[in-house]
Amino acid sequence: MTPAAVLSAASGVALVLLSLALLLTVLRIIRGPTLPDRVLGLDMLVAIAIGLIAVIAVRTGFYLYIDIAIALGLVGFLATVAFARFILARGLSPERRTPGTTEIPQAKPRPSQAGRRKRKGAR
């Protein structure tokens, strides 16, 4: 077997397996019982699409596809961060939200180490 034949066979198997994974991930997105399940499915879908693009780039020899895969990875990451912020903001109780803003409230600052030492010594 020549190296070209091995590469062709390996890329064919990879395309079949990635296509199957893509199909199963789409089913998980559709049937996902909760919103975080769907967000995780979308993130996995982006990762599988990046793999498909990379295999197609190797198979065709048109390596500009790798740049497209990198851009898709960046967009997928930003989408995941946006969905996470949406889920976090949606889960806050109404009294913790600041009316008229989309900012997520920050936690209260903890006392400094110096303040703790003073309290320990005072006991």
Curated annotation (Swiss-Prot):
Alphabetically sorted, this entry's keywords are: Cell membrane, Membrane, Transmembrane, Transmembrane helix, Transport
GO CC, one annotated term: plasma membrane
InterPro entries xrefs: MrpF/PhaF-like
Principal place of residence = membrane
* Protein location: Cell membrane
Write out the GO MF terms. Answer: sodium:proton antiporter activity
Q: How does it sit in the membrane?
A: Multi-pass membrane protein
Region (Disordered) residue ranges read 95-123
Q: Does the keyword Phosphoprotein apply?
A: no
> What sections of the protein cross the membrane?
4-24, 38-58, 64-84
Q: Which family does it belong to?
A: Belongs to the CPA3 antiporters (TC 2.A.63) subunit F family.
* NCBIfam families cross-referenced by the UniProt entry: PRK12599.1-4 (NF009245)
Q: What is this protein called?
A: PhaF2 protein
Upper lineage is:
Bacteria, Pseudomonadati, Pseudomonadota, Alphaproteobacteria, Hyphomicrobiales
